[in-house]
Every structure is written in structure tokens, then in C-alpha cells.
């Protein structure tokens, strides 16, 4: 039984896997880690191994608690990966992007896959049918665009994102919604079209916190999966058991 931990700036996600099957997922504030960690230990005493991925430095007490309880793998650029990484600067590659590519290798082996993660940033990552990671693109995320428009102008308001805005805005608020939401959706469709023309039988994975607000046509080759990153971390942990 594995414990997967994905640490963000404010929140921590935990997931328990057994035989590659997700048993439970939790999301809580970083300050509430120890309370939730104790509950997890009581509920799942069979956990033996854990993987930790964090975008920030975690409290040393938190790391020590994990090391004391389990065999801990901390994701970094030196960890063995289940794919060939051709990123020119692997030490700068985000851990979330690594996990997403690993999930693509696990779920869609032998296929060309484009993973789109709509989070703080919108990231595009491509792995080939030969299990080679080529890289991708990073674009400003939904919230970042709304906040930037408000911060770097004198009079434009900070607008709350809403799905499916009309194309032609008839007020400042609706114009901002149209420009940002529709603009991102056009970016998504255009990027998918460009990748699709270069890679045969391309499968697209659409994930991330803002994937529910944004909409792209879910054709046969496009799949939404909110647990894709956690599944990728678990696959990396399983892969390293054999190394």
C-alpha cells in the first residue's frame, strides 16, 4: 500500500493506492497536515512506502514524520523515471509535469500523448509512442490572467471566472470574461490542432483545477482525469521499487 503526497503552496493532497487502485484522496491546508496524517495512519496501517512531491520546501518536521513512518521517495531530478527525458534543463522541470508524463506512460503506453494541465499555469507536455518526453509549453493560467489584467491597468476590475461566456461582451466584465475564457479555449484548440498535425493518433489528457471552467470538445481522443497527477506519482514510486 502506497501513500502519495502532493504539496502545493497552500494545500496538500494525499492519496492512498493499493495495487495501482486509488482508495482515498484528501485535500487539506498545509497547517493541518499532522492531524490528517495521524488519521491516515490509523485508517491505513498497511501503508509501507510513500512518495513526496512538493513545489515548495516543506517543514522539516513534516518530512521527518514521513521518513520515520515509511520508506520515503522524494521526487527530484535524480529520481529514476519510467520514460526517456529529453528536456534540455531537467533540473528546472516542474515535478507536477514529471508526474503527469509518468501517468501518461502508465495509462497510455505506446501512444503519442499530449497532457494539458490547467492549473496556476497552463502546461502542455508531450510524450511519444516510444516513451520519450520531448517537452511542451507553459502559458499563464486562468486566475493569473484575471489578476494580471486588474493589476497592470488603472481601471479594469478583478472579475470572477465563469464558464461559457458569450463571445461578444456587452460590458467591461463580460468583455474580460470573453477575452480570457474564450481566449484560453481558442489557445487550447489551436495548440491541440498543431500537435495533432505532427503526431499520429494523438491522445489528449485534460486535467487541472481549472479544467472544469474551461471547455474543449471532448472527442474520442480527449479525456478528463482529475487524479492523473496522483496516479503518475504512484507509478513513479512503483517504478523505483524495481530499480
Swiss-Prot record:
It comes from Christiangramia forsetii (strain DSM 17595 / CGMCC 1.15422 / KT0803). InterPro entries: ATPase_NBD, Type_III_PanK. This is Type III pantothenate kinase. Its cofactor is NH4(+); K(+). Its EC number is 2.7.1.33. SUPFAM superfamilies: Actin-like ATPase domain (SSF53067). It is found in: Cytoplasm. Belongs to the type III pantothenate kinase family. Keywords: ATP-binding, Coenzyme A biosynthesis, Cytoplasm, Kinase, Metal-binding, Nucleotide-binding, Potassium, Transferase. Pathway: Cofactor biosynthesis; coenzyme A biosynthesis; CoA from (R)-pantothenate: step 1/5. The keyword Kinase applies. GO terms for biological process: coenzyme A biosynthetic process.
Amino acid at each position: 500500500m502506497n501513500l502519495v503526497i502532493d504539496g502545493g503552496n497552500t494545500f496538500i493532497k494525499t492519496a492512498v493506492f493499493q495495487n495501482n487502485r486509488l482508495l482515498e484522496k484528501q485535500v487539506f491546508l498545509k497547517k493541518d497536515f499532522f492531524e490528517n496524517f495521524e488519521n491516515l495512519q490509523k485508517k491505513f496501517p498497511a501503508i509501507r512506502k510513500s512518495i513526496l512531491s512538493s513545489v515548495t520546501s516543506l517543514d522539516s518536521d513534516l518530512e521527518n514524520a514521513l521518513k520515520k513512518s515509511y520508506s520515503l521517495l522524494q521526487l527530484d531530478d535524480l529520481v529514476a523515471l519510467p520514460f526517456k527525458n529529453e528536456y534540455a534543463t531537467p533540473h528546472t522541470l516542474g515535478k507536477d509535469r514529471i508526474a503527469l508524463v509518468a501517468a501518461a506512460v502508465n495509462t497510455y503506453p505506446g501512444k503519442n500523448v499530449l497532457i494539458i494541465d490547467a492549473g496556476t499555469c497552463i502546461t502542455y507536455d508531450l510524450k511519444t509512442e516510444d516513451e520519450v518526453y520531448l517537452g511542451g509549453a507553459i502559458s499563464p493560467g486562468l486566475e493569473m490572467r484575471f489578476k494580471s489584467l486588474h493589476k497592470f491597468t488603472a481601471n479594469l476590475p478583478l472579475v470572477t471566472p465563469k464558464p461559457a461566456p458569450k463571445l461578444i461582451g456587452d460590458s467591461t466584465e463580460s468583455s474580460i470574461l470573453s477575452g480570457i475564457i474564450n481566449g484560453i479555449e481558442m489557445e487550447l484548440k489551436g495548440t491541440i490542432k498543431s500537435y495533432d498535425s505532427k503526431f499520429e493518433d494523438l491522445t489528449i489528457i485534460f486535467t487541472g483545477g481549472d479544467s472544469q471552467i474551461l471547455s474543449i470538445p471532448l472527442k474520442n481522443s480527449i479525456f478528463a482525469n482529475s487524479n492523473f497527477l496522483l496516479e503518475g506519482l504512484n507509478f513513479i514510486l512503483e517504478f523505483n521499487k524495481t530499480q
